[in-house]
Curated annotation (Swiss-Prot):
Membrane spanning stretches: 6-26, 66-86, 135-155, 177-197, 257-277, 283-303, 382-402, 428-448, 493-513, 537-557
Family membership: Belongs to the KdpA family.
Annotated function: Part of the high-affinity ATP-driven potassium transport (or Kdp) system, which catalyzes the hydrolysis of ATP coupled with the electrogenic transport of potassium into the cytoplasm. This subunit binds the periplasmic potassium ions and delivers the ions to the membrane domain of KdpB through an intramembrane tunnel.
Protein's UniProt name: Potassium-transporting ATPase potassium-binding subunit
Record membrane topology: Multi-pass membrane protein
Name of the gene this protein is made from: kdpA
Gene Ontology molecular function, alphabetical: P-type potassium transmembrane transporter activity; potassium ion binding
Keywords assigned by UniProt, alphabetized: Cell inner membrane, Cell membrane, Ion transport, Membrane, Potassium, Potassium transport, Transmembrane, Transmembrane helix, Transport
Organism: Francisella tularensis subsp. mediasiatica (strain FSC147)
């Protein structure tokens, strides 16, 4: 138990220590200031901008920025889709893997361009090396950079005033890849290789075991993809077992690096925001609220897994309980990680829009599974994905400012800018589109007989498997309850739709809000006379409960039919 507390404290301290330097670095990169990596990144950026031509030089309005973002995503989608369909005739296909069916290729392409990395295939048997490296790994970089671009555009809109432009998407995209994601990923990949993660393009090995049978050992360019998988909060595993596989996550060191890299950029953006708007206290308040939400989720999930079987009334279980004192849920977990390392990793991955797992979420207790769903359902705002976590949290921040200001009889304003009805329309659109998407698609799937046939469990847990899939898709997480066999035409298409709506619907609202904020006057006098201090402890509490009430209650009825009912059923076993 003491070792668990030490690990947790070390993890939190590490995140806190890297937040300021990495946040300052991100600020310098996007504010066109000199950095230590200019010598490495600038040559790539010059070539990239030369190819783009004039489109990369002019500042863009919100509509132009969004149009460029969508145009890029459409091109990326077509690129990935074609490779997945034709991978059977493309090079570097040592296992002679055939091209995907169109519905599965469509689902996978949408999944990777939206930074979701939902996988209805097994990586080691469903995708060739060529497709892994050129299609999926590349999207791990650029889809993360797209989210980062949106966050930076939003931050600019708060910092700027009385102008019409929020930056240039193409320029921001290059900076996100060449200055931030690529250099850090190279370092992480090298560390992974030294820790035993394979990095090659050799055919799978056929070995004879001591039992006299033949076993196929998969390998491939794993380290390079694993590095950006976590740093870019992508989560899609090279193997079906994801980070539970010893080739993806061989040691406690790689496990720790993956957890830190998942939160690194999301945490740093809180400081980037504070520094850019000239109020670092505001950034640290955001960091603090995120941290409290994370700790609560981790505590509930860990206690549920450590003591989740204590209440079962089976005589055999009670006999064991009498001998050992308590029963921990080790089903679906690697013995080398144990309960706490598993729950910590999965709390991190579901809090961020990562979706990587080092244990089987479907085998978690219903209460722990519910916490994983809640982490995603509130909009992935507990640090969240690269960029997406920050702009998702900012929507709740705007709502809290609006509610708090009206409660004390003041005109809503944030950092000297008046918050008006149009701003709140975009805010509520961003906050409600994903929950609506989840509830509609889950309700439809729950009454379709063909979906029932894909479930390995019935009743409340079967419903939880469906609910989890659409929560994960709409919030761009990508993790799953493995009891759902997702490779059907209906699930491939509807989950793809939920990923598209959850990603680009929210981004559209965020960029439109940025376009509104950037045009406003910034009155320091307005900020000073307002009695709503947005850096105070009271305001932090208001933001905290706004997230729980608005984010949590929208999905609570569905949770009542799934994991809550599942937990109550277990109590009476």
């Amino acid at each position: 138990m003491i070792s668990n507390f030490i690990l947790f404290a070390l993890f939190i301290v590490t995140i806190a220590l890297i937040t300021k330097p990495l946040g300052s670095y991100i600020f310098r990169v996007f504010n066109n200031e000199r950095t230590y990596l200019d010598w490495l990144a600038k040559p790539f950026q010059r070539v990239y901008l030369l190819v783009l031509g004039e489109s990369s030089k002019k500042e863009q309005t919100a509509k132009a920025y969004f149009f460029s973002l969508v145009s890029f995503s459409v091109m990326a989608f077509i690129f990935v889709l074609v490779i997945l369909l034709l991978q059977g005739i493309l090079p570097l296909n040592t296992q002679e893997i055939k091209g995907m069916s169109f519905p599965q290729a469509l689902n996978t392409a949408v999944s990777f361009i939206t930074n979701t990395n939902w996988q209805s295939y097994s990586g080691e048997t469903g995708v060739s090396y060529f497709a892994q490296m050129l299609a999926l790994a590349v999207q791990n970089f650029v889809s993360a950079a797209v989210g980062l671009c949106v966050a930076i555009a939003l931050i600019r809109s708060v910092a700027r005033h009385e102008t019409a432009t929020i930056g240039n998407f193409w320029n921001d995209l290059g900076k996100g890849v060449f200055w931030i994601l690529l250099p850090i990923s190279i370092v992480i990949a090298i560390v992974y290789i030294f820790q035993g993660v394979p990095q090659n393009v050799m055919a799978y090995l056929h070995v004879h075991t001591l039992a006299g049978t033949e076993q196929i050992i998969s390998q491939g360019p794993i380290a390079s993809q694993e590095a950006i998988k976590s740093l870019g909060t992508n989560g899609g595993g090279f193997f079906n077992a994801n980070s539970a596989h010893p080739y993806e996550n061989p040691t406690v060191i790689t496990n720790y690096i993956q957890m830190v890299s998942i939160f690194a950029i999301a945490a740093a953006l809180t400081y980037t925001f504070g520094k850019w708007v000239g109020n670092t206290k505001q950034g640290w308040l955001i960091f603090g609220v995120m941290l409290v939400l994370f700790i609560i989720s981790l505590v509930v999930m860990t206690i549920s897994e450590l003591h989740g079987l204590d209440f079962l009334h089976s005589k055999d279980i009670q006999d064991i309980y009498g001998q050992v004192g308590h029963l921990s849920n080790m089903e679906g977990k690697e013995s080398r990680f144990g309960v706490f390392y598993s729950t910590l990793y999965n709390t991190v991955s579901t809090s961020a829009s990562d979706g990587g797992v080092n244990s089987v979420l479907d085998s978690y207790s219903p209460l722990a599974g519910m916490m994983a769903m809640l982490n995603m359902a509130i909009g992935e705002v507990i640090f969240g994905g690269v960029g997406a976590g920050f702009y998702g949290f900012f929507m709740f921040l705007m709502l809290a400012v609006f509610i708090g200001s009206l409660m004390i009889g003041r005109a809503p304003s944030f950092l000297g800018k008046r918050i008006e009805a149009n701003d709140m329309k975009w805010t509520m659109f961003a906050l409600l589109i994903s929950p609506c998407c989840v509830l509609v698609f889950t309700g439809l799937a729950a009454v379709i007989p063909s979906v029932h046939q894909t479930l390995t469990n019935s009743g409340a847990h079967g419903f939880s498997e469906i609910l989890y899939a659409y929560i994960s898709g709409a919030n761009n997480n990508g993790s799953a309850f493995a009891g759902l066999s997702a490779n059907t035409n209906y699930l491939n298409i509807t989950i793809a739709l939920s990923m598209l709506i959850g990603r680009f619907g929210v981004i559209f609202a965020v960029i439109m809000l940025a376009g509104s904020l950037v045009k406003k006057k910034r009155s320091l006098q307005m900020s000073e006379i307002s009695s709503l201090d947005t850096t105070s402890f009271i305001f932090a509490i208001l933001v905290f409960f706004t997230i729980l009430l608005i984010g949590g209650l929208t999905i609570f009825p569905a949770l009542g039919l799934g994991p809550i009912l599942d937990q109550l059923n277990l109590n009476f076993l």
